[in-house]
């Protein structure tokens, strides 16, 4: 398997080939032609992301079928059994083969919206649901990225600059309070 530096080089090479063939970057590791519905959704700020990748509209419900699949009802996640024997046993017994799940809290939903805004629009508005303390914690986690000039932060908004777009995962991870807890 390639090392991290080789992976980055392969990604940049692939990105260049996409650009040379008329594709545009629409999100993390995703490309589309300008005529594609994904690009149009990005331009209209209606791009959405779910477990399967980017979509041209919000996914209200996603039902995962099969072993290890993940379902998302927007307010909760559920993952099916990952082990084939456990999965088959539950299915044969007529039991829904859920391995684990999580109900999202009101705070989770606010954080989720900010993360999706960053993933899909490379910006999010601070004044939506975040308290001063949480904003301060997020800014502390983003300090190195701020110092490198990869994002702009104003009183009401955080915007990922073009040169920061390749670090959007690192940026939105600062919003995920569960990674810190």
Located regions from the model:
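Short, amphipathic alpha-helical interaction segments positioned at domain boundaries
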Residues: 163-181
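An alpha-helix initiation/capping motif
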Residues: 8, 136, 162-165
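A short, conserved structural fragment
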Residues: 146-156
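C-terminal scaffold of the Radical SAM
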Residues: 1-128, 132
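Minor-groove-contacting beta-hairpin "wing" of winged helix-turn-helix DNA-binding domains
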Residues: 157-161
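Short amphipathic alpha-helical interaction segments
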Residues: 131-147
């Amino acid at each position: 398997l390639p090392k991290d530096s080789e992976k980055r080089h392969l990604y940049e090479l692939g990105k260049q080939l996409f650009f040379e063939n008329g594709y545009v970057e629409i999100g993390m590791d995703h490309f589309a032609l300008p005529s594609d519905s994904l690009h149009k959704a990005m331009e209209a700020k209606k791009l959405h992301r779910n477990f399967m990748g980017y979509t041209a509209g919000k996914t209200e419900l996603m039902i995962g079928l099969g072993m290890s699949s993940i379902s998302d009802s927007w307010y909760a996640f559920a993952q099916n059994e990952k082990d084939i024997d456990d999965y088959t046993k539950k299915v044969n017994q007529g039991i829904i083969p859920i391995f684990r799940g999580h109900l999202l809290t009101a705070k989770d939903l606010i954080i989720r919206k900010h993360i999706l805004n960053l993933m899909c629009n490379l910006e999010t508005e601070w004044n939506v649901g975040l308290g001063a303390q949480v904003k301060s914690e997020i800014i502390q986690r983003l300090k190195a990225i701020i110092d490198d000039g990869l994002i702009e932060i104003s009183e009401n908004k955080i915007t990922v600059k073009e040169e920061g777009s390749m670090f959007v995962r690192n940026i939105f991870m600062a919003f995920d309070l569960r990674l810190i807890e």
